Every structure is written in structure tokens, then in C-alpha cells.
Amino acid sequence: MRRRPRRRRILPYLLGALALVLALSFGVRALRYRLAHENLPGSGIAAPDFVTVDYLPANEYSRPGTPLEEISGVVIHYVGNPGTSAAANRSFFANLALTHETYASAHFLVGLDGEILQCVPLTEIAYCSNTATDYTVSIEVCHGDETGEFSETTMESLEALVAWLCETFSLDPAEDVIRHYDVTGKVCPKYYVENEDAWLSFKQDVSARIEEDKTANGEAS
């Protein structure tokens, strides 16, 4: 009968040891992640104020944690679900960890009201651009109807985001900003595939914004 208290005294030690093991395991994983991502092009770069950072949980289907070792382009997509919000599309990506439906994500989502969500760090790949996944930043853009055309509010935010990425990673909008279509031939983003002039105009607008930013910052063009 007197042995039971001893067992009760041992239990806290066992629980403490288990907690220590778990803490050490978490610390080792965190250290491995930091070492794998600390010298990448996107490391140490904070999102601009107009971007809301809301990372997906780490998982095999939408945020595998694979290092993005090169950033030499930006790929524009459209979500393909008319009327859906940036938050709804982020939820779809996050839920893939449970549904295992497909592999999909994007670094950024631009919404119908111009909101921008960052879903994946710039030190990691996003499952979005097929063979270009390993060296590009991907942007999914929401649209109001089947035409795939983006609203003026959405466009304003998209231009600002792409200009910031080009400035940050020394990219040329004319050459380094591409459509999903340019990678695989998929009709994405639909409006810009079916309206080439609008696509070229968008890239020119991004270039113009970059020049405006340089002028505002007192930099030579």
C-alpha cells in the first residue's frame, strides 16, 4: 500500500523528462530550419506594410518548407474561382494538409478589395508554377467573374506588390515577370492570356511604378 505514493512521485519526473525531450526535439528542428534558410535570397526580407503575413501551417501539400534557393522571376496566376476572396483561397491551401486533395499554394494572394496575404515565406517554394517553382515567386490573384479580369483596386495592389518584388530582387518586369501560361501553356491568368496588350501594359505600369519609386527615393534611374 505504501508503494503507490512512490509511483505518484515518479510520475512528475517522467512528465518533466518527456517535456524536455519534446523541447529539445523542437529546438533541433527549429535550428535545422534556420540553418537551411538563413543564406537564401529571401532571408531577412520583411514584407512591406501593405502586405498581411499569414503563413500556412507547415505541411506536405501546401507548404513543404523546401528552400527557395533562387529568385529570378515572378509568376502571375488567377485563382480560377470567380468571386472568391483571398482569405477563402488561403483557407483552401491550408486545408490541403487535411484533405490531401492536391499540392497547391502561392507566396501571395491578392484579393478582390486589394488586400494582399502572404501565405509562404520567400525562403520557401510554393506549389504553384510547375517547373518554375524552384526559382520564382508566385502570386495568385482573385477576380470577380469568368473573364478573369482584375478590378482596378486589385490591379493597384498587384502592381505595387510586383514592383516591390522586382526592386527587392533586382528583377526586370519586361523579362522576369511572367504568366503561368508562359511556363506551361495553361490559360492562366485567363484575361492576360486572351488579352496580350493588357498584359504588356501591366508590365509597363510596373516598370513605371519602379521608376516613380526611385525618383521618390532620390535614386538615379
Give names to the regions the model predicted.
Residues 1-129, 221:
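N-terminal catalytic cores of peptidoglycan-degrading enzymes
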Residues 2, 12, 16, 29-52, ...:
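Basic/polar, cationic surfaces and motifs that engage anionic cell-wall
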Residues 75, 109, 138-140, 178:
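Soluble periplasmic/extracytoplasmic beta-strand elements of cell-envelope proteins
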Residues 80, 132, 137-146:
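Cell-envelope and extracellular/periplasmic
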Residues 116-137, 203-214:
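Glycine/serine-rich loop-strand microenvironments at binding/catalytic pocket rims
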